[in-house]
């Protein structure tokens, strides 16, 4: 089969290669999926660049955790009725070397989720990390019905789904965005208000947008940079759920202030989510796909031969929405 691989760390153009490699073998609890689309996420780019020094200890890596395709074979413990299913895949390149940037993948059957008939393979490849991370951020600390939620970076991959999860389940959601185009994208999916986080003291605008009431929940894309702003507008007993702190990866925490707020700080990464949380997310994702209640954005698509461009555009931080690699 044809696959993108890397066997050393470095820039996308330098280390990503297209090669013909052996087709995957199948274990009893696995399925083999003929992939149509592979989703590129920031975590994939960081892995390729060398964020995890032991990643290549067992040989080359086929990148990417998210994807979509059609099941073409099943292991002995999987019903043959699954052959022919259109599926979305998550957590493919986690604690293993082989991800979705290939023509075929063997993967635990529980990680290949049947797509509703009304949902395209393109949409399926967008779901794993962004939609599941957003779901965990919104729901990990209980019902959001009637709650006030602030989502920073609402036009981003995770933030876009976080706004939708909050609104679909009865919350008031205010978002931040850095330009008029992103602001409109947030409003189009239901945000009750949007403020510009590039402005000085933007948290005051966020408070005004919520009629002066502080927030119950925060879903935050840049924890370290935003903390000095966001703490001022969070309620006592509130929760901050954050999935990234790229600009300030080692933030200092005002411990006493946070303690006296009875603040819950939740760090979210999809790989570490409890299985129940993953299953809850999958159930809600498929239900809302079936009812056409989730919106998705594909920003760019590239052929497998141009996979390096997909990594580079993620690194440039110049686009919003999903980046896909076309396999078929």
Description of each model-found segment:
Residues 80, 90-153:
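NAD(P)H dinucleotide-binding glycine-rich loop of Rossmann-like/cofactor-binding domains
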Residues 86, 148, 172, 238-239, ...:
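Short glycine-centered segments of the SAM/dcSAM-binding site in methyltransferase folds
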Residues 201-213:
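Short amphipathic alpha-helix with an adjacent loop that forms part of the alpha/beta core around
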Residues 125-199:
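Mid-domain Rossmann-like dinucleotide-binding core that forms the NAD(H)/NADP(H) cofactor-binding site
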Residues 225-294, 326-328:
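Glycine-rich phosphate-binding loop and adjacent beta-alpha segment
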Residues 22-40, 51-93:
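Glycine-rich beta-strand-centered segment in the early N-terminal region that forms part
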Residues 100-101, 178-185, 250-255:
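Short, glycine/polar-rich helix-capping loops at beta-to-alpha or helix-loop-helix junctions
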Residues 291-300, 308-328:
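C-terminal capping/lid region of NAD(P)-dependent oxidoreductase domains
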């Amino acid at each position: 089969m044809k696959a993108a691989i890397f066997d050393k760390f470095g820039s996308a153009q330098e280390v990503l290669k297209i090669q013909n490699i052996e087709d995957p073998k199948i274990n009893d609890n696995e399925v083999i999926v003929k992939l149509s689309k592979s989703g590129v996420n920031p975590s994939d780019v960081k892995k390729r660049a060398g964020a995890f020094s032991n990643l290549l200890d067992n040989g080359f890596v086929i990148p990417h955790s998210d994807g979509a395709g059609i099941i073409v074979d099943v292991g002995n413990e999987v019903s043959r009725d699954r052959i022919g299913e259109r599926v979305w895949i998550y957590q493919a390149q986690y604690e293993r070397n082989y991800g979705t940037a290939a023509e075929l993948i063997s993967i635990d059957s529980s990680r290949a989720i049947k797509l509703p008939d009304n949902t395209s393979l393109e949409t399926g490849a967008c779901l794993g990390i962004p939609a599941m991370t957003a779901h965990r951020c919104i729901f990990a600390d209980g019902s959001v019905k009637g709650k006030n939620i602030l989502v920073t970076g609402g036009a981003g991959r995770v933030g876009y789904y976080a706004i939708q999860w909050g609104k679909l389940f009865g919350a008031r959601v205010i978002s931040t965005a850095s330009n008029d185009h992103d602001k409109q994208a947030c409003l189009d999916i239901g945000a009750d208000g949007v403020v510009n986080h590039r402005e000085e003291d933007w948290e005051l605008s966020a408070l005004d947008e919520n009629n002066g009431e502080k927030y119950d929940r925060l879903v935050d894309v840049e924890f370290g940079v935003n903390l000095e702003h966001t703490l001022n507008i969070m309620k006592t007993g509130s929760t901050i759920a954050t999935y990234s702190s790229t600009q300030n990866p080692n933030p200092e925490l005002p411990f006493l202030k946070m303690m006296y707020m009875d603040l819950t700080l939740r760090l979210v990464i999809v790989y570490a989510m409890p299985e129940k949380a993953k299953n809850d997310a999958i159930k809600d994702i498929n239900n809302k796909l079936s009812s056409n209640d989730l919106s998705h954005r594909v920003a760019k698509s590239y052929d497998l031969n141009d996979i390096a461009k997909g990594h580079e555009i993620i690194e440039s931080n110049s686009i919003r929405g999903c980046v896909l690699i076309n396999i078929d």
